[in-house]
Amino acid sequence: MKFQMKMKSELCRTYKYWLILLVLWLSGVTQRETGVLIVDADCIPPNGCKALAYYRLKQGDDLEKLQGRFQTNNSEVLAYNPQLVDANSIQAGTNIYLPFDCLCLNGELVHRFSYTVTTNDTAEKVVDVTYQKLTTVGAVRSASNSGDLSSIYSGQSLTIPVRCYCGDPNVDPKYGLFSTYVVQADDQLTSLSTNFSVDADVISKFNSDTRNLSPDSIIFIPSKAANGSFPPFSGYVLGTVHWRSNVGIIVGVVVGGIVLAVLLLFALIFGFKHFRRRKLAKEPTMQQSGLLSSSSMAGSKPSRSGSTMLPVPKSVEFTYEELAAATDNFSLAKKIGQGGFASVYYGVIRDQKLAIKKMTLQCTKEFLAELQVLTNVHHTNLVQLIGYCTTNSLFLVYEYIENGTLDHHLRRRKSDDKPPLSWLQRVQICLDSARGLEYIHEHTKPTYIHRDIKSANILLDDNFRAKVADFGLAKLAEEGTGTGIVGTFGYMPPEYALYGEVSPKLDVYAFGVVLFEIISGRVAISSALPSENDQQSPAQNRESRTLTSFFEPVLNDPDGKTLLPKCIDPALNGEYSLDAVWKMAQLARRCTHQSPDMRPTMRFAVVQLMTLASVTQEWDVGYFSRASSQSQPPSGNDQL
């Protein structure tokens, strides 16, 4: 009877949960026009589109500078501007289209560009000159969460919102690409029609009032793609039923009823399975379903501690006595690492070197997460889990990685007798780490998000090949809003730090920060020192600065490549290919884009780094061949 009452209670909770979801889903279905049943969304289409900004080149502008300002690339710009035969010889006064992603943010179609203030900038200059009134000072103030922009300073980061438009199939489905255009003083509807090769009435029906065009106002003009034709509206597909009668409503109700029935059935099945899982998890026995694949550990015996953990395949359950003996009772001399909730010890069992992580009993969630991932995921660029123990504390036992963490090597002391990481080693470490992340993002079943990528969680073996470690915060790769913010500041993307939005692009952002670390040798967040001309004391003016903001001025500068060496780790002693470092910095910049939709996938990063590794190997051979041919013997750093 007690079991039946628990089962009934569990099913009731599950039923209510799914019923609430169904009601919310049905309430989102509205009839915007007679006979058109659509999912409620403030943007058309909800997933955004590609858009263009109409821009007149001014003196001193060039494509490289504009690409940084509008966060696009050379190939995209040339694709939408076939009149530009030579990108290096464009003149002031030339009108061009700058492509960007038009995104639905807070119910508005917009793109928020990131701009780093330079010397002599004012808010008005940034808006009126740099972005040619595609936005307003008020919009920048609101988007940047700044109360006052009357005194902006060099290095300050501003968010530049530029409105955009994707079209509307209910107005005219033949047009799906639009330019954001700032009305000039002498503009007339007829002149715009001529300049953009589009009928005046077409411009009028997509804009509210074109009879009295107001200077500096924004209008959206249908534009042609690279093939010379107007692309049709193609993004408005989510939840549409293009029937011109009330049949759409009937269909919606019928479908809703079917969905309700299916959801109730799934709720019953889910409730039963969920209850059974919880019941099994509380049983005080452990079934050992597999031993180590490593023959050197085959003699380890399963623990008889009566632990309450779930069965774990392909892992050994060590006894507490084994781990204590291997670490001299967890002595300080055997301690090789310390985190917020765990200590790591070195030990040897059956002649195999091991790293033993000791966690408090309060870390059950992190313990289970790492156990779940690493017992099911195996890759050469992911640290290997050997086994575990749940007596007295929670223990995870890993393969021992000889050269420790990446951050230790990047921030090595001058007294350290180990040489700094060479540029070739750094590129290989980036590629190895990217491959490990790509594997958990795309090739495992289920796929995972790490959520705590940082240089301290990348380990280097005796050949300085990288392995991603510490999966205590990993979760299934289901996009949505997380229940709590976890991870490390400096590596968190804005959508996660502010709103808790979780996706694989969270790891991509953190990986981009790691790339910046590898280039510069700096920490992800540091205290910025005041300039020499600052009248305040260093203590008064010291503030935290992220590594992304450290690189922004250089990457946004038209002479950024020339300025880049000041950002490069001095430990490299000039022994690197500037072209290769610049390409890695550009990849890091893409990975740390403010918008997750604009960040690449880890697969893209792997491909880029494979090319970079190949080029770097060729450079490395040539560089040291030239060095060895010189009459003077090479310095210590040349021998890396």
Swiss-Prot record:
Its EC number is 2.7.11.1. SMART domains: LysM, S_TKc. Its main location: membrane. ATP binds at residues 336-344, 357. The active site is at residue 452. It is a single-pass membrane protein. The keyword Mitochondrion does not apply. Lysin motif (LysM) receptor kinase required as a cell surface receptor for chitin elicitor (chitooligosaccharides) signaling leading to innate immunity in response to biotic stresses. The CERK1, MEKK1a/b, MKK1a/b/c and MPK4a/b proteins are involved in pathogen defense. The pathway induces rapid growth inhibition, cell wall depositions and accumulation of defense-related transcripts. This protein is required for response to chitin. Is able to complement the A.thaliana cerk1 mutant. This is Chitin elicitor receptor kinase 1. The gene is CERK1.
